Amino acid sequence: MKSVNHLVLTPGSLSLAQLREISRHKLTLELAPEAINDINISAQIVQKVLDEGRTVYGINTGFGLLANTKIAPEDLQLLQRSIVLSHAAGTGQYMQDATVRLMMVLKINSLSRGFSGIRLEVINFLISLVNAEVYPCVPEKGSVGASGDLAPLAHMCLPLLGEGEMSYQGQIISAAEGLEIAGLKPIDLAAKEGLALLNGTQASTALALEGLFHAEDLFAASSVIGAMSVEAAMGSRSPFDPRIHAARGQKGQIDSAMVFRYLLGEESEISLSHANCEKVQDPYSLRCQPQVLGACLTQIRQAAEVLATEANGVTDNPLVFQDTGDIISGGNFHAEPVAMAADNLAIAIAELGAIAERRIALLIDSSLSKLPPFLVKNGGVNSGFMIAQVTAAALASENKTYAHPASVDSLPTSANQEDHVSMATFAARRLRDMSENTRGVLAIELLAAAQGLDFRAPLTPSKAVAQAKAELREVVAYYDKDRYFAPDIEAATDLLYTASFNAYLPLGVLPSL
């Protein structure tokens, strides 16, 4: 990358760090010059098929169950237009511009590999839309994640035909207006181009990548806030001893324990104050954090590997092979790897919230934490964090339902030609809602743990924990008596949305950071 906001794309080489940037920041894009030759050769192979009068699926045939129907040469251009229009059958709210931007870059990356038989001018059209920050309006629902994300990608490609709606600077405009802003005119798609644009897993992958980056942020926040709860509850540092975790050998657990040691430091005034207490063991929500968060970290890392591969792969069909000139039909559009990665991320996100909710319950329970009941003075007159914990329980419980695997829920489509599908798009899309729920739980724990630390004063926590608490206190004051609670949760949630707690972790723990 030349800078944060300009990317010279060498097809097939996007890093997770670059993908995170693309998902969260606007950028300008240009294609590396060395990619152009592969694109042109691939398109020439498709043209050769037409010149020789051969019949090849996806070039001069129908699609799906109609694959055996040969299309007359004079109808090929109409075929490409028709497939885009007919497949733009999505429903629901529009995806966020950032999601569409990431999806477009993923599609550009795939098409530019030279396996798709698509002309350079079509790829440059998509690049121009990204650079002009004019994004197609893409409904969230309508893909089952096999034969690609057909409906979402069709909506993404409508502007090439001058059809559909677009988003520009927060406003919904017509495709005609959007193309004028970008300095473009509609183009006629050539043979295979409509299918190449629509086939692929880019919608599912974009949504899953966003879920991955949220999961990374939540892991970092869980670690920082979990360490704060250890200090607030006067928990032991012994469970983070590296010898314990080395004996088991689980890499995620070992690294999570290392993060807790990094955050808690050697000792603090709080930890020294109870070094010789009679308590033998802490509850699991404190003591087993490396085991639980470490397992989540393992799932995050595995999903990251799958999604980084998918982001750089070619997932349309059929594929053009330049070395032999062969055009071969396969099934790379089937998004099962994305669906399973998203399912695993869903479990990790749910568990980060579930154990955080238990730590909140621990902190407000005076018999366990030795803090004032519900973390407030003058209990009875004040209810303190009583209902905030109920809110956390509601959010954590909702995620349990969301965490049901989507990849096992297949329905046949296209008259049973497409008889097993991945449901990757929903598997990935729900990660946003799950992340919002877990972020809400962590925001409440952050408020509770900071409140607990205030009750421990003048004893001080570790340096990192004190710094994190200070960040919160810049936006939320100490809870001295009952007040309107929702704004406090909102402010703490907004703080977590900044992902500032990512900086508290050592480099290399999370895949994209």
Swiss-Prot record:
Posttranslational mods:
Contains an active site 4-methylidene-imidazol-5-one (MIO), which is formed autocatalytically by cyclization and dehydration of residues Ala-Ser-Gly.
> Which example biological process does GO assign this protein?
L-histidine catabolic process to glutamate and formamide
Keywords from UniProt, A to Z, are: Cytoplasm, Histidine metabolism, Lyase
Name any GO cellular component annotation. Answer: cytoplasm
UniProt catalytic activity: L-histidine = trans-urocanate + NH4(+)
Q: According to the lineage, what is the superkingdom?
A: Bacteria
Q: Which Pfam families match?
A: Lyase_aromatic
- Say yes or no: keyword Cell inner membrane present: no
Recorded hits in HAMAP family, A to Z, give: His_ammonia_lyase
The subcellular location is: Cytoplasm
Q: Which organism is it from?
A: Shewanella oneidensis (strain ATCC 700550 / JCM 31522 / CIP 106686 / LMG 19005 / NCIMB 14063 / MR-1)
What is the taxonomic lineage of the source species? Bacteria, Pseudomonadati, Pseudomonadota, Gammaproteobacteria, Alteromonadales
Keyword flag Cytoplasm: yes
Q: Which Gene3D superfamilies match?
A: Fumarase/aspartase (Central domain), Fumarase/aspartase (N-terminal domain)
The EC designation for this entry is 4.3.1.3
The name on file for this protein is: Histidine ammonia-lyase
**Pathway per the UniProt entry:** Amino-acid degradation; L-histidine degradation into L-glutamate; N-formimidoyl-L-glutamate from L-histidine: step 1/3
2,3-didehydroalanine (Ser) modification sites are S147
Q: Which SUPFAM superfamilies match?
A: L-aspartase-like
Which residue numbers mark the cross-link 5-imidazolinone (Ala-Gly) in this sequence? A146-G148
- Main location per UniProt? cytoplasm
Query: What's an example of a GO molecular-function annotation for this chain?
Result: histidine ammonia-lyase activity
